[in-house]
Amino acid sequence: NARRKMMTEFFMAMIPPTATAQEHKVAVRNGKPIFYDPPEVKAAKEKLTANLARHRPPEKYICGIRLITKWLFPNDGKHKNGEYKISKPDTDNLQKMFKDCMTLCGFWTDDQLVASEICEKFWADIPGIYVRIEEL
């Protein structure tokens, strides 16, 4: 009898951060470049990590997974609820920092396990981030 596949699903009601991991700053010390996160990126990582920690699965994923993420940005009144957001930030930049935070929180052993990824961003009356993780 096969083991039941793990699945995790949750919604984090929040205004999603728009700062992304791509926004590294560089300082030069003793002739060597030092990369660091500017304060807004550091704050975004802390916000995501604090919210994600509440939804950590009972055990880490250790096999291939599908990650479905829906980023719901606050509607500015110019868009319909659920309309696709086709402006910055880019989905790949959002996802990189998000997966790094999920790794830090212990969702999986390594984000290389994410073999299938669906990421969408919308304008929404109720902002937040919807997440679903499925074992493949």
Residue ranges and their predicted role:
Residues 2-136:
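Acidic, proline/glycine-enriched N-terminal capping motif
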